[in-house]
Amino acid sequence: VRIGTTEAGKDSWDVFVDEAGKAGITLVTTNFTDYGQPNVALTQKQIDVNLFQHLRFLGEYNVASNATLAPVGATYVVPLGLYSQKHRALADIPQGGQIAIPNDPPNQARALFVLKAAGLIALKGGRATPSAADIDKGASRVTVALVDAAQTPLSLKSIDGAVINNTYLAQSDIDPKSALYADDPTSPGAEPYINVIVARAEEKDNPTYQKLVDVFHSPAVTEAYAKESKGTQLVVTKSGPDCAAILGRIEQQIRSEK
């Protein structure tokens, strides 16, 4: 099975590949450095499945590309946090400070909600997928800099803070528990951010791909990911149809805001 990810090279990924092998599935991994690539590769049949994204990211891709990629099953959900090398608490971030956030629309929207909940920005318009253009500058304490998600850890050296996805925390040796603020992955509002294994719509019920979801939830893989996320990652066992129902609501919402 040809699988695309942004996580190859991590110990947790190696454990997943090993456990799949024990279950009779040989995984051939293609690692992508850019979040924009794995869905295109899947649509173009260069890979069979991918594992790197949450449901909102998938919804944005499907709507923008008129695609029908579908969730096979859920894997996990993680909090999204604000990190800083310059400040030790939210209160230390100065008026007019600058925070880096991911520039892709779904992660940008979630990062803005994190900053809003942390009391650093105000948003106008009430959109479900806000962008930096929806920030009420007059009512906000900080400004945001949009950067590629992979670059957010590097920006910590030069500005007040950054909202960083879990994928890049481990790669940058940042402790997930050092976040100045993070959203709550157990809240109903976190449903769009459930990560999923994804296939082309016509292959979403492929028994081998379904088995991959089971492998992901095996004790060895669960333990490897828990170790890497320092216990911040929550296992989610929703089925493909359950995930598809959430995805349908997300896509409807995105279309209504276009």
Task: List each model region and its residues.
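Short, well-ordered beta-strand elements
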Residues: V1-A8, I25-N31, G97-I99
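A conserved helix-loop-strand patch within extracytoplasmic ligand-binding domains
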Residues: V72-A122
